[in-house]
Amino acid sequence: MPKMKTHRGAAKRLKKTGTGKLKRAKAFKKHILTKKSAKTKMNLRKSTLVSDGDAKRIAQLLPY
């Protein structure tokens, strides 16, 4: 059986935590920022975890 390959797009966007959960950056932080408040932009800087429903599918993209 051939080796499983890591999905490179997912690998660049996600990191595995020590407990095996997936960490991701928040969306809406790239452009059109003038109409967003400073508080909103500050909160968008924080990272968050991938939801449990999505994590199962995404884990298949990152086998290693």
From Swiss-Prot:
- Name its GO BP terms in alphabetical order: translation
Disulfide bonds listed in the record: none
Q: Where is this region: Disordered?
A: 1-25
- Record-annotated membrane-spanning stretches: none
Q: Name one GO cellular component term.
A: cytosolic large ribosomal subunit
InterPro entries attached here? Answer: Ribosomal_bL35 (IPR001706), Ribosomal_bL35-like (IPR021137), Ribosomal_bL35_sf (IPR037229)
SUPFAM superfamilies according to UniProt: L35p-like (SSF143034)
Record keywords, A-Z? Ribonucleoprotein, Ribosomal protein
Recall the GO molecular function terms of this protein's record. Answer: structural constituent of ribosome
User: Pfam families of this UniProt entry?
Assistant: Ribosomal_L35p (PF01632)
What protein family is recorded?
Belongs to the bacterial ribosomal protein bL35 family.
Q: Which NCBIfam families would you find in this protein's record?
A: rpmI_bact
Q: What is this protein called?
A: Large ribosomal subunit protein bL35
Protein's organism: Clostridioides difficile (strain 630)
Q: Which gene encodes it?
A: rpmI
